[in-house]
């Protein structure tokens, strides 16, 4: 990020000062590219999208992963990663409340270390009446356990209120798992609409409608296959080449 998600009064001043010591930049999204040029109009940089993570094991079938997590429901949705205010977990909880009775037979996995008071989310879940459908793991997940959460899931949901880019989408793509994301920041840049996922407004109504439509379309296997092809463009070699080009200029 150029500017932190939770902004501070000194961010702009400190960023400008810090960038004065930088020779060149690699930006991972067009949003960050625009932010960089607003600070350093003549910046020397390369644009290279966030690569797909390839460090996670992908050895479990959906059935095996669900068994390990003790999930018996047919539908599984995943919210994964650090839980901070800008991640919009409240949006997702409120969305699930709206479609709770319609969706049926589902589990929402909330997995990630909470950088806020988790009690507020526990209270939201209770008030939404979806406690029985939500499995929470409010702590860091080591690399060797990441796979079971993604392998068990039909879709990864990112209801972010702001975003530069997302490593979570690229983990989802590693497991050929589709995504539903907010149309903010750099997130739409890495989603092929209707083929690898869906982009919607960051509101509970929009996410409720998108999640309901996702399951009504019943084309998860097609999305999985699309992602398998689409993700090849997000390679680590491309980023290495971008860095080498900067260094060799």
Regions found by a protein language model. Give the residues of each.
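A short helix/loop element that forms part of the nucleotide-sugar donor recognition site in Leloir-type
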Residues: 57-71
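Acidic donor-binding loop of glycosyltransferase active sites
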Residues: 148-164, 177
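Conserved acidic donor-binding segment of nucleotide-sugar-dependent glycosyltransferases
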Residues: 193-194, 198-205, 211-219
């Amino acid at each position: 990020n150029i500017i932190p998600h939770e902004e501070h009064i000194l961010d702009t001043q400190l960023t400008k000062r810090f960038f004065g010591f930088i020779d060149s930049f690699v930006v991972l999204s067009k949003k960050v590219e625009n932010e960089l040029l607003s600070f350093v109009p003549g910046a020397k940089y390369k644009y290279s999208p966030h690569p797909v993570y390839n460090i996670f094991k992908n050895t479990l079938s959906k059935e095996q992963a669900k068994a390990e997590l003790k999930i018996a429901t047919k539908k599984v949705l995943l919210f994964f990663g650090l839980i901070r205010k800008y991640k919009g977990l409240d949006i997702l909880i409120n969305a699930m409340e709206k479609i709770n009775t319609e969706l049926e037979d589902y589990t929402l996995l909330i997995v990630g270390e909470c950088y806020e008071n988790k009690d507020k989310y526990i209270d939201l879940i209770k008030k939404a009446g979806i406690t029985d459908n939500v499995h929470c793991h409010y702590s860091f997940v080591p690399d060797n356990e990441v796979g079971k959460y993604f392998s068990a899931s039909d879709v990864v949901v990112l209801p972010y209120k702001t975003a530069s880019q997302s490593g979570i989408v690229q983990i989802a793509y590693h497991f050929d798992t589709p995504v539903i994301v907010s149309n903010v920041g750099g997130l739409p840049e890495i989603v092929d609409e209707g083929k690898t996922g869906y982009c919607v407004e960051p509101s509970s109504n929009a996410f409720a409608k998108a999640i309901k439509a996702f399951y009504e379309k019943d084309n998860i296997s097609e999305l999985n296959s699309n992602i398998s092809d689409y993700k090849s463009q997000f390679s680590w070699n491309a980023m290495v080449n971008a860095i080498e080009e900067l260094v060799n200029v």
